[in-house]
Curated annotation (Swiss-Prot):
SUPFAM superfamilies found in the cross-reference section: ARM repeat (SSF48371)
Keywords linked to the UniProt accession: Membrane, Nucleus, Ribonucleoprotein, Ribosome biogenesis, rRNA processing, Transmembrane, Transmembrane helix
Organism: Candida albicans (strain SC5314 / ATCC MYA-2876) (Yeast)
UniProt xrefs under Pfam families: BP28CT (PF08146), HEAT_HEATR1 (PF23243), U3snoRNP10 (PF12397)
Name assigned to this protein: U3 small nucleolar RNA-associated protein 10
GO cellular component terms attached to this protein's record: 90S preribosome; membrane; preribosome, small subunit precursor; rDNA heterochromatin; small-subunit processome; t-UTP complex
Principal subcellular localisation of the protein: nucleus
Record has Manganese as a keyword: no
């Protein structure tokens, strides 16, 4: 930008808020954030200030920093402060204050208070102009909120900062920009991103940043960085430095008072997010990584309040680090606590890649505690990482700090477990050996090393007891006081001495270790015996490095050799050496094998009387030492042969075989010293004082031997086992120090010593008690181990008391809800508990034994007031509750055992269970305890017990005194749980077949309960229980020989039927079907139907229509499940029950009353009904049966009708008997119906019942296939047999049924020939005969309807009905129907039926019926005319419909012969007001489709003109007429249209006069109706014109013009305006349709139009609507002019002046039409000559010389504006001519004229001109 331009811009910015005129000032002042511009323009500063201070006060409450603005921006003096009058310094300070306020108000833009405050800055200080940039920056995070639009709106477009130019479009549209636009702006303009980043940096520094701003920056920055992921170079050069600068500011530790904790958190999380994204896109250098890490960890809150985000960002940051894995200074002080470890574990589970970050922290913090804690998170499968860690361990192995050495040991052990080979390889590469490292770390790293190596005792000879290196050690502090290290009393001293020994050895050469140890032993220990116990224990301690242990063994050998003086016997060491031979290390075993050989060798050379070495050190003060004799000890040594010793070296388990198979079973001649050897060895092993290193192997050896069961375990029973719980913690500590896996090894072995086969019951009881204690021990490991031992040894406990203790303990653990590591219930279910044990356990928890049993005769549960009172007492209640819990668990276990079909079931168990059932009822009722689950489990146990008993082959005998069905019934009734009830019902069902005599006496209560409760349950279990109970109890009753089984069934079904409303709907059918199949269809279906009928009758009586319908639906679904024969049999039996209902009221006490009363299916309710009640019941039951038969979908495969058809149609011989059975049952039902009709028509007249019987009879006959049906009704239809009203009614019903059956069922295309012949030969003649005789009106109607149905059905298929014989019969029948027996009858019903019959015949025979045409159509039309005077509108409607159907039939079949009556037919159809329009429309469509269209058009026009159909009062009828006319025109040929053109034009003129006709008749139709009809008129006319050519249409159009102008050919007296309106409406539509084709037709209109326009301008004619339509017509003509029609001079002259003259007095409402017409005209005739004329014509109407009105000027100005818009530069040449007049208009007195010119015309001209018009105007 040039210097001059920049100066001008600066001046412009400074003076942007300076307004030199009132309008500009008003405009500036009207810009507001909260007010409408018009409202804002009127407000003064005092009002605005008042509102602003309210907002400021609210903001001050939220943030005290706003208070400082009260004395500056919002001081009272600011009201009168005009920034345009201030000095430069004042303005500078003002801008700083405004900027400070805007940055501070950013977080509160969503509040109304902030807008009120900022409003003051905008209105008073014009911040929207001078501080626009900052306003947008602070509001930008709210770009999706309306407040952002408000901010943009108040900033003038010219003052919008250039960097925000991309917002112009959104500002203009007042829309919020989408997020994509914001991102696009950042993406495309780095300077904008840099600008915003620097603004954010200032916000951070000034502590004014807020959450929305951070979210906005983060979302856009992340997306921006991602978009440059493929252009790293550009990203690195431009964006990354900017982003890193901002991120660094965010990471700086913030001052607490300046920021809230939430903003501090947001800053940190924002920076973390950006760093994470950057690190994934851009590979940072090591320096940047370190710098960012330092920045992150510099804040002390990073690993406190933001642990997880900090760890995530650090892991993401270092994830792609490719440099060397070395110490990072930033990580040196990295502190890892439990919280951080927990977070790391969480991140690891969430699959974060932590490996690089963790290994760097590990290396940087090594070898501190932090490094060891990180080891689980390091991927040791990475070879590089593995080697680095190994080398670090080696480098730090010489440390003297115990804590560091401990960490190094743990790390090294982890490495060896992870990859032993790689660990070994790495050590070798660094010239290290495992033994050396173990010595340095003074701990064992590899448990089994080089098992193939052999123990080398060669260096023993070179060992000395005094070497130089040891002399540097101060032994005065290490003097031992222990008497023996075989005693745990001296464990602490042993550990201290051992630690010092390892320290000495680690500093010495490995080759000198034996000498060092010997010297150490000599210096530290007072006696060689104590020294030997120390060395022995060191050699057996796994925590000691292997090399030291081997050296210790060598030292022991040297010491023994030195002590072997021929008088010392060392055989007491043999048991300890045997323990050592069980060691896991082969080298250790090999060393002790050498030691054993040495002892044996010394023993064999000894003489008698030798002293026992280490006796006191081993046994201490123990008196009973169990030594073998010297002779036996020598024999023992001989048993330990060289082969045995070698075996133990190779396989330590061989020790067990040598002990138990060789030594303990040894025989020496006749003596058996083996038992002494056993005592000797086990006495020593079981010494309580021995340390864990010895005990562990002893326990393990005996435990393994005890797997097969051995009494040797009892050596440990009184000592180790009995004291285990008290000494366990001590042993755990010892094992930990000694390096023994206590929980997985030692404790398992101890528990393995307990249990197994035992010869002593006392010991078994002791062991079971010990296991019980172990099961409830707080230690989870001991619990699990003891639980496993119980599962292993439970069956080996012979005493039932021992097993019962264990069972009870496990149940107690369950009851007490103790937290244990195993599942006691799973254990109990897995244990093999036999029946006796169950009986013992259940007996021990039975409740109520203290309450005496009542006598058998009473058969009631134990319950009394005293027991209730007793249960109230808390102590008893608590005891009962505990027993209940225990009982419940035992029952669950029993249920599990019974399900597994273990040998548990038995009658004695069932007896106990029954006793428990009584007790539970007592607890539930009297104690109010929750017994439902226990009862349910008990019921399951009882059920399973009975089922298992039934499946066994043994004979079962029950004690009827203890196993009683009444107890079960009582429990069923008392229990509120459906599950308990159902299971007990199943118990009864199983008992019924196993022991029917037990339950037979309780059948009635059982059935009553099932009916009252079980059937109501909505679950599969209840349904199954119910069905099983019925299925098993009823057969048991029958097989037991009880006579009144039927009564039982009736009682059962009556109970169920009573509960029917409460049975879930979806279960009803399944329930009753299963009952029926269980009880037998013949014995139960009719009962169910009858009982359901009573339910139906009861619901009908109570007006419960929904319930009665649901009964019918149920029975319908129920019947589907049975065959046709079964269903019919059930209905027959139902009718018999119906017949048992008495006709008259019964006398109470009579025999008939008693019989009925005693039957459950009738009961007292029916027996006591009065006569009227009985009549209602009979009718309702039949109605029920009738509805059931009629409600089904008879075409379903499962319907009775289909099933009957399948039986009756099947011709196979095997089905003959079934067919006869079905027909016999059907005849029985129809006979019942006819007999009942006779009874209740004659003997006991009941009209309502007879009506139901007729319906029932019809539905019954409807079930038959057609051929059977026809044969069954023909005789009843013969009029000769109709002797009384009953037979007539039967015949009528049969005829109606036949009609319905033929209509719905007959498919002639697939009809059987037998049916067709039966219809033609039997049914039709009978019907025609009946029609001819006309016996009864209703019967006549039925016969005619049936006749028409048959003819329609069979005639449509073209079968035998097309034959001449049948045709002849039909023609004869047509002759009968057209007489007074049909068409000429007086009854509407008969007339309608006869018309249907005629229609059916005409449909088939067509032209063959022409001879009877005069007897049909004219009478039909007369019948139609008679409907207008008929009082019964419904009959009239039916008659009209029937006539229309008849006419449509004739139109289709013989259309040519309908021409003569076409006008009458059309008038009939169009005037049938009672018939729906769509029906009449379809009939009219038939006329259009089937008849000559020219004739149809002619008839339609004649109906309108001559019949004056337009006078019809129904606009719908006229619409129907027009629709038909339109359809006719659309379908007819052009030739046909031309022939009828004159007549059609007459119709069209009449149609155009329709509006006048309506107005003349008191506005017969409303305006909308008229418009709708006129639209149809125009549609018909245009469609017709389309059929004509120019030659044929022009004269017609001329006639139409003459009618419009002069009224020539008018049929009504119409005024000029009305005609012209009608014509021009039509003509305008015609122009829109034909466009330029019809432009030339305007010649017929030119003069009349010109004359009309002149009359309008002169004011002699006032018709605004007509004027508007003419202008629209002219506009269309100008627009569609393609042949310069209007450019012809004469036409131009004719229309130009009249058209422009309309400007003089045009109405405001239609001015726009004139402007459009003139501008279109100018565009159409554009030429220099015509334009000049038009300009001068238009000047007349804007010039003051002609005294034009303001309205004239305004419309002229608008016209000129539109012309310039359309013509553009073509009219610029006339600008000099127009300028004076424009200038004149700009100074017009009328302000509206001035504004119209200034805002409209001048702006348009300037746009076209491209420069201001001021130069021309001046």
């Amino acid at each position: 930008m040039s210097s001059l331009a920049s100066q001008l811009q600066s001046i412009n910015e400074k003076t942007a808020s300076v307004a030199l005129d009132r309008k500009q000032r008003s405009k500036l002042h009207s810009r507001s954030l909260i007010f409408d511009p018009k409202q804002a323009a009127t407000q003064d500063y005092e009002y605005i200030y008042e509102i602003a201070t309210e907002g400021l006060e609210d903001l001050c409450e939220l943030d005290s920093r706003f208070n400082k603005f009260k004395s500056t921006l919002f001081s009272e003096t600011s009201v009168n402060l005009d920034r345009n009058l201030q000095t430069k310094d004042v303005i500078s300070q003002l801008d700083k204050n405004i900027d400070a306020f805007l940055t501070l108000v950013g977080p509160y833009y969503g509040l109304t208070s902030s807008l009120k405050a900022v409003e003051w800055l905008v209105r008073r200080f014009h911040a929207n102009i001078h501080n626009a940039e900052l306003m947008i920056l602070t509001a930008l995070p709210y770009f999706q909120h309306p407040v952002f639009v408000k901010v943009l709106n108040v900033i003038p477009k010219q003052n919008l900062p250039q960097i925000f130019e991309w917002l112009v479009g959104y500002k203009d549209q007042l829309k919020t920009p989408p997020a994509s636009s914001i991102l696009k702006a950042f993406r495309n303009d780095f300077h904008f991103f840099n600008f915003y980043s620097k603004f954010l940096n200032d916000q951070i520094k000034n502590h004014t940043v807020y959450k929305e701003q951070l979210v906005f920056y983060l979302s856009n920055t992340v997306q921006l960085l991602a978009s440059f992921s493929k252009n790293i170079e550009e990203l690195n050069e431009t964006h990354i430095p900017v982003v890193l600068e901002t991120t660094a500011l965010m990471l700086l530790p913030q001052q607490k008072p300046k920021y809230s904790s939430s903003i501090n958190s947001d800053l940190k999380l924002t920076s973390y997010s950006i760093i994470s994204v950057l690190s994934s896109i851009f590979p940072f250098s090591a320096d940047i990584l370190k710098s960012l890490t330092v920045s992150i960890l510099e804040d002390e809150d990073a690993l406190k309040g933001f642990t997880k985000p900090t760890l995530i960002v650090l892991s993401q940051l270092w994830k792609h680090f490719q440099g060397n894995l070395e110490v990072i200074e930033a990580f040196k002080n990295f502190k890892i606590g439990q919280h951080e470890l927990g977070v790391l574990d969480e991140l690891k589970n969430e699959n974060y890649q932590l490996s690089t970050f963790i290994i760097l922290v590990f290396i940087s913090t090594f070898p501190s505690n932090e490094s060891y804690k990180l080891l689980p998170f390091i991927d040791l499968s990475n070879k590089t990482v593995f080697e680095i860690i190994t080398k670090l361990v080696l480098q730090n192995s010489t440390t003297q700090e115990d804590s560091i050495r401990s960490n190094l040991t743990k790390i090294a052990q982890s490495l060896t477990k992870s990859d032993p080979k790689l660990f070994q390889t790495t050590l070798e590469s660094e010239n290290w050996k495992v033994d050396e490292l173990e010595l340095k770390l003074m701990s064992v790293l590899v448990e089994s090393k080089n098992d193939e190596a052999e123990f080398d005792a060669g260096d023993e000879d070179n060992a000395v007891e005094d070497i130089e290196i040891v002399k540097t050690v101060d032994f005065t502090k290490l003097q031992s006081t222990a008497k023996s290290y075989f005693n745990t009393e001296y464990d602490e001293e042993f550990n201290l001495v051992l630690k010092e020994l390892k320290s000495v050895l680690s500093a010495s050469d490995a080759k000198l270790h034996v000498s060092v140890i010997l010297t150490f032993l000599q210096k530290v220990f007072s006696t060689p015996e104590v020294a030997l116990t120390f060395a022995f224990r060191v050699a057996l301690t796994p925590a000691v490095p292997l090399s030291i242990r081997l050296s210790a063994i060598k030292s022991i050998r040297i010491k023994i050799k030195n002590a072997a003086n021929g008088k010392t016997d060392f055989y007491l060491l043999i048991p300890l050496i045997l323990l050592a031979l069980f060691d896991n290390s082969k080298l250790i075993r090999s060393g002790f094998a050498q030691l054993l050989r040495l002892v044996i060798e010394i023993k064999t050379k000894l003489t008698t009387g030798a002293a026992l070495f280490l006796e006191r050190e081993i046994y201490g003060s123990v008196s009973d030492k169990k030594y073998p004799t010297p002779h036996d000890s020598l024999f023992l040594c001989s048993l330990l042969s060289e082969d045995n010793v070698k075996d133990t070296v190779l396989d330590p388990s061989r020790v067990i075989n040598i002990l138990f198979d060789s030594i303990f079973k040894a025989k020496n001649g006749k003596s058996k010293p083996g038992k002494y050897f056993r005592s000797f060895i086990f006495t020593q092993w079981s010494l309580c004082s021995l340390p864990i290193v010895l005990k562990a192997n002893a326990w393990k050896i005996v435990a393994q031997a005890n797997k097969a069961g051995t009494d040797d375990r009892f050596f440990f029973l009184d000592g180790d086992i009995e004291n285990y719980f008290s000494k366990r913690n001590v042993w755990i500590d010892q094992a930990s120090i000694a390096g023994i896996a206590f929980f997985d090894n030692a404790e398992v072995s101890v528990v393995g010593l307990v249990g197994g086969v035992a010869s002593n019951d006392k010991n078994s009881n002791t062991e079971s008690e010990w296991l019980c204690r172990a099961l409830e021990n707080p230690s989870g490991n001991l619990q699990m181990t003891a639980n496993n031992r119980v599962l292993e040894t439970f069956d080996t406990f012979k005493p039932i008391e021992s097993r019962l203790k264990i069972v009870n303990k496990l149940v107690d653990i369950l009851i007490n809800d103790d937290i244990v590591e195993f599942d006691p219930m799973a254990t109990l279910q897995e244990l093999n508990i036999d029946r006796n044990l169950f009986l013992q356990a259940l007996t021990s928890v039975q409740i109520g034994d203290q309450i005496p049993e009542q006598g058998i005769a009473k058969r009631r549960r134990r319950s009394s007031n005293s027991t209730k009172q007793a249960m109230v007492r808390d102590e008893i209640n608590n005891m009962a509750s505990g027993h209940l819990k225990k009982l419940t668990f035992l029952l669950e276990i029993l249920e599990s055992s019974l399900r597994k079909k273990r040998n548990v079931a038995g009658p004695d168990l069932l007896k106990v269970l029954f006793k428990i059932l009584t007790d539970l009822e007592y607890l539930g009722n009297d104690g109010n305890l929750p017994v439902l689950y226990a009862q349910e489990t008990l019921a399951s146990c009882m059920l399973l017990n009975i089922v298992n008993l039934k499946s066994s082959s043994k004979e079962v005998k029950f004690d009827s005194n203890s196993i009683r069905a009444d107890l079960i019934v009582n429990s069923i009734r008392a229990s509120p749980s459906p599950q308990v009830q159902n299971r007990l019902l199943l118990v009864i069902s199983e008992l019924a077949s196993l022991a029917p005599e037990v339950i037979l006496h309780s059948v009635m209560p059982i059935f009553t309960f099932m009916g009252a409760h079980t059937v109501r349950q909505d679950d599969e279990f209840s349904s199954s229980a119910l069905q099983q109970t019925v299925a098993k109890v009823i057969p048991a009753l029958a097989s037991n020989g009880l006579s009144p089984v039927n009564n039982e069934i009736e009682f059962l079904l009556a109970s169920f039927a009573t509960a029917f409303p409460h049975v879930p709907r979806h279960r009803r059918v399944k329930l009753f079907v299963s009952l029926t199949k269980t009880l037998g269809c013949a014995e139960s279906m009719h009962l169910i139907l009858f009982l359901m009928g009573q339910q139906y009758a009861n619901n009908v009586h109570k007006n419960k229509n929904g319930d009665s319908q649901s009964v019918v639906e149920f029975v319908h679904g129920y019947m589907k499940s049975f065959s046709a024969e079964e269903q019919l049999a059930g209905i027959v039996a139902f009718t018999k029950l119906w017949n048992d209902i008495p006709l008259n009221q019964l006398e109470p006490g009579s025999e008939e009353f008693e019989v009925l009363n005693n039957r459950p299916v009738f009961g007292t309710t029916i027996a006591t009904l009065g006569q009227s009640g009985l009549a209602v019941l009979r009718n309702d039951l039949l109605q029920f049966l009738d509805e059931t038969l009629s409600s089904e979908n008879k075409h379903e495969l499962s319907s009775l009708k289909t099933k009957m058809a399948l039986v009756l149609i099947d011709d196979e011989d095997s089905e003959v008997s079934k067919k006869e059975s079905v027909l016999d049952k059907f005849r029985a039902i129809t006979s019942f119906a006819l007999a009942s009709l006779d009874t209740f028509t004659n003997s006991h007249a009941d009209i309502k019942l007879c009506s139901t019987l007729y319906s029932l009879l019809g539905n019954l006959l409807d079930l038959l296939p057609l051929n059977y049906f026809i044969d069954s009704i023909v005789a009843s239809l013969d009029v000769d047999t109709l002797s009384d009203s009953l037979s007539i009614k039967v015949a009528r019903n049969y005829a109606i049924l036949a009609s319905r059956k033929f209509e719905t069922e007959l498919n002639v295309a697939h009809c059987d020939q037998v049916v067709i012949e039966s219809v033609i030969n039997n049914l039709l003649p009978i019907l025609i005969k009946g029609i001819k005789k006309n016996v009864d009106v209703e019967l006549q109607q039925a016969y005619l309807d049936t006749f028409s149905t048959i003819v329609n059905k069979f005639g449509a298929s073209g079968t035998e009905f097309a034959s001449s014989d049948v045709s002849k019969v039909l023609i004869e029948s047509l002759g009968i129907v057209t007489t007074d027996r049909g068409l000429l009858n007086e009854q509407p019903e008969v007339i309608i039926a006869s018309i249907n019959a005629i229609t059916s015949i005409v449909n088939i025979l067509g032209v063959k019926t022409l001879g009877l045409f005069p007897k049909v159509v004219p009478p039909a039309l007369k019948i139609w005319e008679s409907t207008n005077s008929l009082g019964d509108k419904e009959s009239a409607k039916l008659l009209q419909g029937s006539v229309l159907v008849l006419l449509s039939c004739y139109i289709k079949k013989i259309p040519a012969f309908m021409s003569t009556t076409l006008e009458a037919v059309l008038l009939t159809i169009l005037s049938s007001d009672l018939i729906d329009n769509h029906i009449r429309s379809s009939v009219l469509d038939l006329i259009v489709d089937h008849m000559d269209l020219a004739q149809v058009l002619k008839s339609l026009c004649n109906v309108w003109l001559t019949k004056k159909f337009y006078t019809n009062d129904n606009s719908g009828n006229i619409g129907l007429f027009l629709k038909t006319l339109q359809a006719t025109i659309n379908k007819m040929e052009k030739k046909q249209a031309t022939t009828q053109a004159t007549l059609f034009m007459r119709w069209l003129i009449s149609a155009f006069e329709f509006r006048q006709y309506s107005e003349d008749n008191d506005n017969k139709f409303d305006n909308n109706t008229i418009h709708r009809l006129e639209s149809s008129f125009h549609g018909c006319a245009i469609a017709f014109v389309m059929k004509l050519n120019d030659k044929s249409f022009r004269p017609l159009f001329a006639n139409l013009v003459r009618w419009a102008v002069d009224g020539e050919g008018a049929t009504l007296k119409t005024n000029e305006v009305s005609r012209l309106l009608a014509f021009f409406r039509f003509f305008n539509k015609l122009q829109d349709e034909l466009k330029s084709i019809i432009t030339s037709y305007f010649s017929y209109l030119l003069d009349p139009t010109s004359a009309l326009l002149k009359r309008f301008s002169e004011g002699s004619l006032v018709a605004t609507n007509l004027r508007r339509i003419i202008l629209i017509g002219l506009t269309s003509s100008f627009k569609y002019d393609q042949d310069d029609y209007w450019s012809q001079q004469g036409r131009f002259d004719s229309i130009c002046s009249p058209l422009l003259s309309q400007l003089s007095n045009i109405e405001d409402s239609i001015g726009k039409y004139l402007v459009k017409s003139v501008s279109t005209f100018v565009t159409d005739v554009s030429s220099d000559e015509y334009n000049e004329t038009l300009v001068h014509e238009l000047i007349k109407y804007i010039s003051n010389a002609n005294e034009n009105s303001a309205a004239t000027k305004i419309w002229s100005i608008r016209t000129l504006k539109t012309i310039f818009q359309k013509m553009g530069e073509q009219w610029l040449s006339y600008l000099p001519t127009l300028v004076p007049y424009i200038a004149e208009l700009l100074e017009d007195d009328d302000e509206e004229v001035e504004m119209e010119v200034r805002r409209g015309l001048v702006r348009v001209i300037e746009n076209v001109l491209g420069e201001p018009l001021d130069r021309y105007l001046s």
